Amino acid sequence: MTQKNKMSTYTKGMEIRRQVLGNKHVENAIKNTNKIDEKFQKFITEGAWGSVWSGDQLTKRDRSLITISLLAALGHHEELEMHFNASKNTGATYSEIAETLMHVAVYAGVPASNSAFKILKKVFQESK
């Protein structure tokens, strides 16, 4: 891959990252980046946002619900809360997220889904 293609993947990744997570979150991530995680931040911007999230086969809403289900199933609560907040930018509704968490309960276990529901209720209350 040429440097030009890498830059366009990074640029596209930053654009989508901002659309989904919001400028404030992305600016905080950039501000807090240092030599320890600089390579990692570039990796997630190009890999996750510039490649996976930029695909044209799924909507941002679909990707949001998939991401939420995986984060809930794996117990990644900090990222889960961030993506619950980001769902406002992807078009995923709280009722769709709740339905997604029902699938998590069946396929990943009730405790994983129960923890996710607690976080969702907190985020929902804070957004009122």
Please give the residue ranges for each predicted region.
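Residues at alpha-helix boundaries and short interhelical turns
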Residues: 56, 74-77, 91, 108-111, ...
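Mid-chain, well-packed structural core segment of small domains
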Residues: 65-68, 72-98
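Acidic, glycine/proline-rich low-complexity segments that act as flexible tails and inter-domain linkers
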Residues: 1-61, 89, 115-128
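Short alpha-helical scaffolding segments that buttress acidic/His motifs in well-ordered protein cores
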Residues: 44-48, 65-72, 100-105
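Short Asp/Glu-rich motifs
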Residues: 106-107, 124
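Short, conserved micro-motifs enriched in small and acidic residues
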Residues: 60, 64, 110-111
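Substrate/cofactor-recognition hotspot
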Residues: 103, 110-114
